[in-house]
Regions:
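Catalytic cores of RNA-modifying enzymes
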Residues: 1-199, 228, 239, 248
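C-terminal lobe and adjacent flexible extensions of AdoMet/dcAdoMet transferase-like proteins
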Residues: 183, 200-253
Length: 253
């Protein structure tokens, strides 16, 4: 079977079981698997008695494979579509667990879409090491940035397990890890406004936060006032501000 869409198929039974173990701990009213590929996780979910769940697969060849090999008694709903283009109306509007060995090239976009959905409750996702470092980074860390902030403001993130390259076929060039996400109450500011402030701040990482936001068109006086309220110097850089402080900052912009 040909490899398309940057797939690296999970073949390590121990890792498969650890992912499914985590999924069952976080199980919700609806379960959705993204990009099942050959069905390694899907088969394990079904083997443990999970029924009537949904898988979303972009690759027509994989869809045909799944239709031929998944147990019919499990009642698995196969949606042949690009998850990033999926209309949420295709899913039930109930608390949902997402599970996936995420395609590396689309991982950040998929995570953002999932966390933004009002009915997201929990997720168990595998990422390449670089994404894991960015998602878990704190203010002042080397990998801290928008992905860190957007993830941590919407979910409690924990490490499930680390995954070596040999767990896949074909093996990727980098190591991976599995993260669990549990929904938290989002900040009480307009999300798009907060998003634009964060993205503008990190557009010029070598500049001070104040200068970066002024370059983006924000009013210098308002930013200065916000930084004073946060008790941080006007020379602070974007990577030195915590996610919670960005929420406060966005209220002034």
């Amino acid at each position: 079977m040909r490899q398309k869409y940057g797939q690296h198929f999970l073949i390590d039974k121990n890792i498969i079981c650890q992912i499914v173990d985590a999924a069952f701990l976080l199980r919700s009213e609806q379960v959705v698997e993204i990009g099942p590929g050959k069905g390694a996780l899907t088969m394990e979910l079904a083997a443990r008695g999970l029924t009537d769940f949904t898988v979303v697969e972009i690759d027509p060849e994989m869809v045909s494979f799944l239709r031929a090999h998944l147990p019919p008694q499990a009642g698995i709903n196969i949606v042949a579509e690009n998850f990033l283009k999926l209309d949420w109306a295709r899913l039930r509007a109930v608390p949902t667990l997402f599970i996936s060995n995420l395609p590396y090239m689309a991982a950040a976009d998929i995570l953002d879409k999932v966390l933004a959905w009002p009915h997201f409750k929990t997720a168990v996702f595998m990422f390449q090491k670089e994404h894991v470092q960015k998602i878990r980074a704190r203010a002042g860390d080397e990998f801290y940035g928008p992905l860190s902030i957007f993830s941590q403001l919407r979910a409690r993130v924990s490490l499930v397990c680390k995954v070596g390259r040999s767990a896949f076929a074909p093996p990727p060039k980098v190591e991976s890890a599995v993260l669990a996400f549990e929904k938290i109450t989002p900040p009480d500011v307009p999300w798009e406004k907060l998003r634009q402030v964060v993205l503008a701040s990190f557009l010029h990482r070598r500049k001070t936060l104040l200068n970066a936001l002024v370059l983006a068109g924000y009013e210098k006086e308002k930013i200065s006032a916000a930084l004073n309220i946060l008790h941080v110097p006007l020379t602070v850089r974007p990577e030195e501000i915590t996610a919670a402080q960005y929420v406060t900052l966005s209220r002034f912009c």
